[in-house]
């Protein structure tokens, strides 16, 4: 019998002494690599074809997780780890970045034969999800400074995912008025960081790993796709003109995203049915973008 390693894998995140077990995975991807220093020691008398090469560092690892939303709402922790401010089940993207360094955690990818890869010094770089005609999936991008293969791992998990949430139809509102003919709504939240280059003399003859990073900026955006319709002649919103300082609420039965003041640019796609896409970002004077999860957080 053959086993798919990906199908049998588990993801466990260690943070603040607790273990978060994500088993409602739709997909994941991870890769590791090393940096090489190589030079040819050529002189006018000797032209060797064999390079002098050493492995001197680990490249930062990129990990992407596609996670189903579940009844325990532990998926919302990725927004905490990204640096959002939490008040109950509400999360706010701060106007000014509160942290110089991103929140760090460690992560295991555990296979069915108990072999696992341990990623250290991890931070969340992106969190994306879409509300459309399918079950919502959270796409999480993670950067890690160090990886290693280990034979032991956390066997007990403090928090695990619950049942996968069923489909719920999305809707978009502006000034309490629904916008018709919605096709899909995609949200993207990013934390852009850079690794600190802190090598010293004690790292000579060692494989260097990244340990610390610093936050450059955080941002939020959304893309809304509609069929191009007009409710009334001279409609002031359902047109192709850009909008600014417009409040928007994107929601379904389980989650809502609020842009208190948004700038909207519109793109018309010509096909059998005209479609218009709204590119949404918060304005500079907007209150914090808010994400609300409806339900009991475990």
UniProtKB/Swiss-Prot annotation:
It comes from the Viruses. Signal peptide: none annotated. It holds the Pfam family Baseplate_Tube_p140. It is found in: Virion. Keywords: Late protein, Viral tail protein, Virion. InterPro entries: Baseplate_tube_p140. GO terms for cellular component: virus tail. Forms the simplified baseplate, together with the p132 collar protein ring and the cone (DTP-pb9 and BHP-pb3). Homotrimer. Forms a pseudo-hexameric ring. Interacts with collar protein p132, DTP-pb9 and tail tube protein pb6. This is Baseplate tube protein p140. It comes from Escherichia phage T5.
């Amino acid at each position: 019998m053959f086993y798919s390693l990906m199908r049998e894998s588990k993801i466990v995140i260690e943070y603040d002494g607790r273990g978060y077990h994500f088993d409602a995975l739709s997909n994941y991807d991870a890769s590791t690599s090393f940096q090489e220093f190589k030079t040819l020691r050529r002189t006018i008398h000797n032209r060797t074809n064999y390079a002098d090469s050493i492995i001197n560092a680990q490249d930062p690892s990129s990990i992407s997780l596609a996670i189903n939303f579940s009844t325990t709402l532990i998926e919302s922790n990725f927004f905490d780890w990204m640096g959002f401010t939490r008040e109950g089940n509400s999360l706010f993207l701060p106007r000014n970045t509160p942290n110089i360094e991103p929140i760090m955690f460690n992560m295991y990818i555990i296979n069915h034969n108990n072999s696992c890869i341990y990623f250290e010094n991890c931070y969340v770089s992106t969190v994306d999800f879409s509300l459309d005609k399918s079950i919502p999936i959270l796409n999480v991008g993670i950067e890690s400074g160090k990886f290693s293969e280990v034979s032991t791992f956390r066997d007990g998990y403090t928090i695990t995912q619950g049942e996968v949430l069923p489909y719920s139809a999305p809707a978009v509102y502006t000034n309490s008025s629904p916008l018709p003919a919605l096709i899909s709504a995609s949200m993207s939240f990013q934390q852009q960081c850079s690794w600190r280059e802190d090598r010293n003399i004690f790292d000579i003859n060692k494989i260097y790993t990244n340990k610390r990073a610093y936050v450059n900026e955080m941002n939020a955006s959304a893309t809304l796709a509609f069929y191009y319709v007009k409710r009334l002649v001279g409609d002031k919103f359902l047109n192709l003109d850009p909008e600014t300082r417009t409040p928007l609420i994107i929601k379904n039965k389980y989650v809502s995203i609020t842009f208190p003041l948004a700038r909207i640019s519109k793109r018309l796609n010509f096909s059998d049915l005209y479609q218009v896409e709204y590119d949404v970002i918060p304005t500079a004077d907007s209150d914090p973008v808010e994400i609300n999860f409806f339900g009991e957080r475990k």
